């Protein structure tokens, strides 16, 4: 009997741990117990006893508009609220007076979650999926369409926050009419925050906290657009907290006022209690009007990788008041005007493209920001992104863009996969050409690129063809190209600057050749009628000459500069010519490593060295 009692108790405990599925419709149907769609529970009935259900229960909401009660209950258990994935959307609306606009008489909050759990504690995991939050009219402190407080983990997926308005403006307890997140860990995936409006402190989203271990927010594949606030973040206000992660996301076309601290994303600086670290990766922040795209106070802490941040050219892309605590780049970014009030510790990489000339128009042209750039080189490869994610301890999926499109092995920076900026060069019948570009690029099929590592006084060059087809060529590489006659198009790439030992230099436009070496002479790539293709003086006595755009030239100093030219027929490839068989010693092999009986015409290997037998 004792054994049976224990077994029964175990069964009862186990059954209590299983989640129950409930089905909800606006008015309910059948028996209204939520056991099926035919017996769906009415929304108002569900709300009236929301905390009587078991932690982990799942609520499926039929498509339709759910008008929230006048006083929204505080939800203290971990549930899943799942709206319709097809057909009529599931909408939580605050439009109580049914006039179609947020105003007096409408609800100030649509859902309030307060789980009383620590950061990362998923014992009360709350999931929101496929729900639109709209029509909240915030006219009191600490309210929002979605308010989350003191909750260790809330996941919000494929939700829309549209046309929520905040008119409250007292005691700094305002802003964030779409989402007010307090001392919580919230992850947004595939969500949209559009057309929300606040007097200030976050046109759509406000993040705040009260402790050193709380306040972590992540946006992955999200769109924040069309929101308004007079100051302190037309899109996002990062007040207090530890981390704000913007990944594979777009923040665009939000509107600030004209006075005060104005910008799309605003953050107070780091301090002992609040790290306030912003991480922007694989994201696009562009086309926001009024102030900077990203604005930070003293001690701002920002990390950026493989992203695009550009304004209209009249205001900064990034503006940091006084000296920031950290502006760390992992490279592969396109950044517009960068403004810091005092000297900073910004560590831009040579793979970053930072220029005041990078603007909304120059990068996106006639494209909407959501359609991706028209003039961006490739950014980081997937291998490079994985290294960055590991270094920054990011556990997010970086393999897809905001639309769920695969980034493949390589893609342009920012949130949207798009065609990369292209470069061009031609190779003639001579099978040689030179090429230089400020960006890196992918070597096309059938072409190899070499650096000149040495020049001999007798007029020969040592060329290392280290960049084969498909390889990534570093930025600012001046190369000798060898391949079949053709006009080639190359995909340009943000890449670290070349550190190759190379006597070739180049220019991105028509410019005079230069060198830091005393007595250096300059050689132009040309086809000499007597000596053939090679590098020859481009001006009298090897003086400087005007080099063509995207072409390489040769710089030689020292004894070898006595040579007037270096014909490519005299390139030192490491292969020696042998015509006297009697001087050969040792076993003879072909290039496939097979031993030969005696010398045969062509290239062979003797004692580890290559020889040409004629």
Regions found by a protein language model. Name each.
Residues 44-52, 67-75, 113-115, 296, ...:
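Short, T/G/N/S-enriched strand-turn elements that build extracellular solenoid repeat scaffolds
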Residues 25-62, 403, 589-597:
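Acidic Gly/Asp/Thr-rich repetitive segments characteristic of extracellular carbohydrate-active
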Residues 54-100, 115-131, 157:
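Beta-solenoid repeat scaffold
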Residues 420-445, 468-532, 539-574:
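A short, polar beta-strand/turn micro-motif
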Residues 15-19:
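Sec/Tat signal peptide C-region and signal peptidase I cleavage site
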Residues 454, 571-614:
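C-terminal outer-membrane/trafficking sorting elements
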Residues 70-80, 155-157, 181, 187-190, ...:
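Predominantly extracellular beta-rich ligand-binding scaffolds that present long acidic/polar faces
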Residues 121-231:
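Right-handed parallel beta-helix
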């Amino acid at each position: 009997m004792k054994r049976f009692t224990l077994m029964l108790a175990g069964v009862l405990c186990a059954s209590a741990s299983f989640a129950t599925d409930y089905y909800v419709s606006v008015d309910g149907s059948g028996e209204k117990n939520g056991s099926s769609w035919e017996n769906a529970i009415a929304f108002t009935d569900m709300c009236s006893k929301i905390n009587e259900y078991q932690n982990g229960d799942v609520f499926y909401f039929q498509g339709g508009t759910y008008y929230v009660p006048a006083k929204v209950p505080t939800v203290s258990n971990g549930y899943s609220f799942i709206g319709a994935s097809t057909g009529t959307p599931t909408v939580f609306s605050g439009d109580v007076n049914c006039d179609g606009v947020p105003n007096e008489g409408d609800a100030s909050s649509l859902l309030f979650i307060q789980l009383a759990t620590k950061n990362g504690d998923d014992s009360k995991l709350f999931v929101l999926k496929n729900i639109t939050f709209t029509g909240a009219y915030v006219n009191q402190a600490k309210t929002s369409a979605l308010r989350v407080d003191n909750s260790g983990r809330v996941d919000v997926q494929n939700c829309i926050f549209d046309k929520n308005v905040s008119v409250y403006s007292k005691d700094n307890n305002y802003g964030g009419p779409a989402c007010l997140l307090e001392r919580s860990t919230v992850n947004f995936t595939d969500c949209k925050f559009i057309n929300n409006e606040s007097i200030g402190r976050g046109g759509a989203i406000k993040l705040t906290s009260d402790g050193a271990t709380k306040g972590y927010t992540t946006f992955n594949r999200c769109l924040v657009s069309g929101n308004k606030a007079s100051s302190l973040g037309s899109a996002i206000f990062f007040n207090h907290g530890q981390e704000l992660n913007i990944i594979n996301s777009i923040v665009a076309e939000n509107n600030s006022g004209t006075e005060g601290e104005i910008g799309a994303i605003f953050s107070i600086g780091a301090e002992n209690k609040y790290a306030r670290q912003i991480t922007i990766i694989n994201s696009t922040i562009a086309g926001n009007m009024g102030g900077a795209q990203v604005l930070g106070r003293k001690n701002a802490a920002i990390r950026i990788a493989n992203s695009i941040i550009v304004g209209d050219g009249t205001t900064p892309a990034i503006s940091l008041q006084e000296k920031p605590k950290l502006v760390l780049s992992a490279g592969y970014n396109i950044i517009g005007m960068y403004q810091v009030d005092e000297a900073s510790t910004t560590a831009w990489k040579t793979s970053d493209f930072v220029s005041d000339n990078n603007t909304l128009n120059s990068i996106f042209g006639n494209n909407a920001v959501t359609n991706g750039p028209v003039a961006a080189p490739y950014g980081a490869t997937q291998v490079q992104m994985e290294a960055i994610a590991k270094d920054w301890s990011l556990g997010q999926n970086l393999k897809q863009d905001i639309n769920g499109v695969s980034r493949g092995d390589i893609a342009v920076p920012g949130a949207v996969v798009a065609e990369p900026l292209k470069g061009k060069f031609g190779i003639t019948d001579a099978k040689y050409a030179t090429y230089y570009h400020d960006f890196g690029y992918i070597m096309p099929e059938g072409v190899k690129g070499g650096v000149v590592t040495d020049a001999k006084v007798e007029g020969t060059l040592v060329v290392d063809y280290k960049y084969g087809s498909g390889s990534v060529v570093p930025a600012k590489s001046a190369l000798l190209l060898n391949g079949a006659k053709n006009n080639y198009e190359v995909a340009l790439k943000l890449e670290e600057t070349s550190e190759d030992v190379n006597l070739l230099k180049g220019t991105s436009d028509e410019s005079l050749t230069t060198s830091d070496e005393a007595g250096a002479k300059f050689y132009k790539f040309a086809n000499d009628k007597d000596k053939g293709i090679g590098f020859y003086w481009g001006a009298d006595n090897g003086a400087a000459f005007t080099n063509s755009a995207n072409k390489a030239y040769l710089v030689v100093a020292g004894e070898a500069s006595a040579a007037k030219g270096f014909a490519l027929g005299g390139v030192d490839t490491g292969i020696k010519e042998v015509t006297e068989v009697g001087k050969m010693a040792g076993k003879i092999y072909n290039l496939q490593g097979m031993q030969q009986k005696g010398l045969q015409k062509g290239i062979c290997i003797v004692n580890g060295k290559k020889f040409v037998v004629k």
